[in-house]
Amino acid sequence: MAEAGAGGLSETVTETTVTVTTEPENRSLTIKLRKRKPEKKVEWSSDTVDNEHMGRRSSKCCCIYEKPRAFGESSTESDEDEEEGCGHTHCVRGHRKGRRPTTPGPTPTTPPQPPDPSQPPPGPMQH
């Protein structure tokens, strides 16, 4: 406290210190580590068959065909004349060597049907 003598003015200074103590909170943080997902990629094994005979192991076809062999038959014997494809009905490209895919149309087992004379010919409709 400070006082001034002659003029009768006095000044009072009060300092207040507030100490707040808080109890530590019981917070916890849990971090879970997860493995990275492996990248999806094709890995060819050393015994993968190159069914397109192009010297590489990639294929635009739907599958890699391994021809079934009889018990005891050597895997090194190959008969190119008996190549028949993968047998999957969903494979529209085929797996036959030297053949290109054809445009969609009637299947070779069904002959094309002649047009029905009772039906109007296909073309633009006229009203």
Curated annotation (Swiss-Prot):
User: What the entry says about post-translational processing?
Assistant: Auto-ubiquitinated.
Output the Gene Ontology cellular-component terms: cytoplasm; nucleus
Which Gene Ontology terms describe the biological processes this protein takes part in?
defense response to Gram-positive bacterium; negative regulation of cytokine production; protein ubiquitination; ubiquitin-dependent protein catabolic process
Region Disordered, residue ranges: 1-55, 70-127
**Basic residues composition bias: residue spans:** 90-100
Pro residues composition-biased segments: 103-127
Q: What's the subunit arrangement here?
A: Interacts with TLR2 and UBE2D2.
What the protein does?
Atypical E3 ubiquitin-protein ligase which ubiquitinates TLR2 at 'Lys-754' leading to its degradation by the proteasome. Plays a role in regulating inflammatory cytokine release and gram-positive bacterial clearance by functioning, in part, through the ubiquitination and degradation of TLR2. Inhibitor of protein phosphatase 1.
The protein in question is named E3 ubiquitin-protein ligase PPP1R11
Q: What is the protein's species of origin?
A: Rattus norvegicus
